[in-house]
Amino acid sequence: MNSTSFRSCCFATASLLAVLPVAFAETPPASQPPVIRMAPAAAGLPALPAVLRNETQDQQDARLQWFREARFGLFIHWGVYAVPAGSWQGKPTGAEWIMNQGKIPVADYRAFARQFTAAKYDPEAWAQLAADAGIKYVVITAKHHDGFTLYDSAFSDWNAVKASGAQRDLIKPLAEAVRKHGLKFGTYYSQSQDWVNLGGGKGKTEPWDEAQKKGDFDTYMKTIALPQVRELLDKFNPDILWWDTEYQMTSERARPFFDLVVAHPHLIQNSRLGGGVLGDFRTSEQRIPASAMQGRALEVNMTINNSWGYRSDNLNWKSSQQLIRNLSDITSKDGNYLLNVGPTAEGVIPQPEIDRLLAIGRWLKVNGEAIYATRGGLYVQPLNWGRTTYKTRAGGKTTLYLHIWEWPADGKILVPGLKQTPRSGRLLAGGVPVTTTITDSGLVATFRGTAPDPDVSVAVFEFDTPLEITNATALPTDTGASGTLLDPSKSPPAH
């Protein structure tokens, strides 16, 4: 993932890309108009049309259906950076960014790979953990910014088979195990930054080692990055291609990568390829947006502690309650929650991460129907007692879920602007009935007793008609450029 300083540069670049006169699409048949999303223009400059694919809206919706319904994914940051584990020359220095932030010479960093043994790596156990946690898809760093691939690449010997103590492909067995459990599989690939392979980008940073000054970026693009992406697609047939960092990715450089994606009809990509390509879903890093937005799907990627890669001194674990509420919050904003773990160099997921994932899984076993295959966005602003999601059914019927974070002292919760009487209401935990009345302000739900769940209690209501919220504020529209920060005034933590 990307550091604060690089991130700011990246988004400034994204705005400037609006001047480029390139549209990534062939002329479609008249019966199949393309889906077009316009990147925002810099002041006084024309916008760049960024065509996702030659497909109708219905076709795009069908391709993204599983992703929109999944709601919960597992991110895995694993690589050579797990060996120094956040420490270089006796000083705490980042995690997955340690080579860059510590200015570690290429030869010294390469030497770490011999200790990257994956000796305790159990892909079946990882997949089982994901399934038990209620995860629906898994994304792993096939290549992070250090250029090291977790599989045997024919285009660089800087990989798990040829350069590391693991001496084997680490991607294939995980892909197989994940799919055996019925989950989707995705690969993360750092297309522009590569601190080891010749010619790879260094982000905003100047080369810190003479070995990095050899080669040029376009040659790297053509001889390493593009062939490796083709390898990933051919070897593992991922369901998601998760790009990261857009530095130096002009439209001309992005076009060949875009063509590879389009050649795989099922493939979904995020918003970080660059060159004006908006992607199928927008990516928010370490930040939950203020509201849902109309337009592209949303994925919020976040850590369980404060780092993505393994860092031995990072013990600032988020509570399971916070993580469950994050899932509730993001789903209520019509997004997916991609939650990260950082295994050790031996391939061990830290126990605090396991414990928290399993806690989420236990909550989902009771309340999962309020998360999976639901939609969010009923309210632009969060409600003071919690969040809402809903499902529409045949014949106009609707199921409404109240995610109750703050259990009411008087037993009453107002659903503002909703003046329809439900056919039924109950708590998901225990099935206790919930009564409702209609007031001038909206629907009031009355609960008995105490909260059935200290983290998030969920009530479900069945309606025979579509929901109508009076005095509702329209959702903002997603017109952001590829990878745009949802709140540009705030920079994310180093990543």
Predicted segment positions?
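N-terminal secretory signal peptides that target proteins for export/translocation
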Residues: 1-6
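Bacterial N-terminal signal peptides
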Residues: 10-21
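Mature catalytic domains of secreted/periplasmic carbohydrate-active enzymes
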Residues: 26-495
